[in-house]
Amino acid sequence: MSTPAIIDIFRSSGALLEGHFKLTSGLHSNTYFQCAKVLQHPEYLTEICRNIASAFSDVTIDMVISPAVGGIVVGTETGRQLGVKTIFSERKNGEMVLRRGFTLSPEEKVLIVEDVITTGGSVAEVIDIVTKAGAIVAGVGSVVDRSNGKVTLAEKQFSLLCLEVKNYDPDTCPLCAENLPLDAPGSRSLTTS
């Protein structure tokens, strides 16, 4: 899929938003990719995940893991296309953990799949879970990389849409200086106790 084609899919799905947003990372931006609005369409979900799975066809993968909430749908479909189990991590008291009986085995080769990467914070937390279990990070795949490839999380990494989007520290955000209303559509605040 070409970059213009992917951007067209986001636009036609109402998933490429402009305004003043607080991202899951805590940074602010004038652009937000609401992947859920794209991934709700089976034809887009299938094609996007086919591209992610294809990017890792030369790597042995035993399992796919995704951070909740945004990565679950794309991770599950990517795992289905690869023919491997899929699990997800989630926050408990602010910490990314495995729950629901999910486990990783030593030496298991794991592909981490996320919807959007900005700073890579959530994926880094999942990498920590994987390595502490003695499993091996086989790669990181995502739908969108807002850093234009500047955030390196694994030796093998693939993003379907890789572009640089302006992000601002909240203390120096020009959108805040203009008193524009702040929208926080991300899922970081969704935690389980």
From Swiss-Prot:
A single GO molecular function term of this UniProt record: orotate phosphoribosyltransferase activity
Record-listed 5-phospho-alpha-D-ribose 1-diphosphate binding positions: E114, D115, V116, I117, T118, T119, G120, G121, S122
Disulfide bonds: none
Superkingdom: Bacteria
Keyword entries, A-Z: Glycosyltransferase, Magnesium, Pyrimidine biosynthesis, Transferase
EC code: 2.4.2.10
GO biological process: 'de novo' UMP biosynthetic process; pyrimidine nucleobase biosynthetic process
The keyword Glycosyltransferase belongs to this UniProt entry's keyword annotation: yes
Cofactor(s) required, per the database record: Mg(2+)
Record bears the keyword Membrane: no
PROSITE patterns reported in the protein's UniProt record: PUR_PYR_PR_TRANSFER
The reaction(s) this protein catalyses: orotidine 5'-phosphate + diphosphate = orotate + 5-phospho-alpha-D-ribose 1-diphosphate
Family: Belongs to the purine/pyrimidine phosphoribosyltransferase family. PyrE subfamily.
Subunit organization: Homodimer.
UniProt function note: Catalyzes the transfer of a ribosyl phosphate group from 5-phosphoribose 1-diphosphate to orotate, leading to the formation of orotidine monophosphate (OMP).
Protein name: Orotate phosphoribosyltransferase
Lineage: Bacteria, Pseudomonadati, Chlorobiota, Chlorobiia, Chlorobiales
Gene symbol of the encoding locus: pyrE
